[in-house]
Amino acid sequence: MEFFYEEQVACIEDDKISNSHTKETGSTENTENNELQSRDDKTNEAFQKLEEEVNKRYEKTTSAFKKLVIEKDDGIEINLPISNETTETAQKYLKKLDENIHSVESLAQSYWSKMKTKNFWSGFSSFDNAAENDSNDKDENSKENEIAVGGNRTEAELRTLSKDKSVYLDNKMDLQLDPFDVDEKTEEICSILQGDKDISKLMNDIVPHKISYKDFWHIYFLQRNKILDKESKRKEILSKKEKETEEKEVEWDDEEEEEDDDKVEAVADNKSKGETKVAVSQEGLKDVSDHVGLANKDESKDDDDDDDWE
């Protein structure tokens, strides 16, 4: 019996030892699992923070890019932030460049018009024709230069309406004197904006926080009508000058024809007079020769008589 009890006690103690060992092993595994779980949680938190930061940066970059780049039906428009001083300086240099280009164009056009005129090379025939053709070339060149300068001036003034915001912000015209319905001009405004990107950009920059939409287009149409009226008046003046010069040229041609006819008649009269003088001189020479022949005969007779007398 004692042996049996001892075995039972030994078994119980072995069970306790195994249970304690199992508990220790389970506790160590649990601690290891807890440590791994905490590490995983920290890693997930770090990745989550990184993703949030990347998303924030991406959103900021996207918003800034959308402000700079605008997608449209006909392409992409890039709007770079430029100061007013830089814009004004660029406008000044562009105006100077336009003026220089216009002067070069006018000189080239005047030179080409002078070279292509018919009277330019024919003017070397005589001094009078050269002087006349030179004056005609100058008149034609001045007219063509006036036309070219007028057209370039009109184009430059129309370009200022599309680029210079001071035209609208520094307006001194009384808009109330001229009634204007912007709704009636909707189709025309749409066509203008589609064809001219500069005025579209200018309108987006100053409308509506600096000037209203209605006043902007009211000023635009008033200024454009003034520019076109000036151009039409210039063309009328040039057409009148052309008519006057054509009439003067016709009168000069008639006078030259009359002078040429008078010169031809005078030459014919002088020629007839010269022939008459020659005829008279020939008859006189014949009479003189006859008289000389008779005189020689008389002298020969006298000589014969003297010989006979001797």
Swiss-Prot record:
Sequence ranges assigned to domain BSD in this UniProt record: 176-228
Disordered as annotated region, ranges: 15-45, 131-151, 240-310
Here the segments flagged for biased composition (Acidic residues) are 247-263, 301-310
Pfam family of the protein (one) = BSD
Q: Which InterPro entries match?
A: BSD_dom (IPR005607), BSD_dom_sf (IPR035925), BSD_domain-containing (IPR051494)
**Basic and acidic residues bias: start-end ranges:** 15-26, 135-146, 264-276, 284-300
Q: Which domain of life is it from?
A: Eukaryota
Q: Name the GO cellular-component terms.
A: cytoplasm
- Further comment found in the protein's record: Present with 3270 molecules/cell in log phase SD medium.
Q: What does this protein do?
A: Acts in ubiquitin metabolism and is necessary for the control of single-copy DNA replication.
The record ties this protein, via PANTHER family, to: BSD DOMAIN-CONTAINING PROTEIN 1, SYNAPSE-ASSOCIATED PROTEIN
Q: What is this protein called?
A: Protein DOS2
Organism, by scientific name, is: Saccharomyces cerevisiae (strain ATCC 204508 / S288c) (Baker's yeast)
Q: Which lineage ranks, top first, belong to the organism behind this chain?
A: Eukaryota, Fungi, Dikarya, Ascomycota, Saccharomycotina
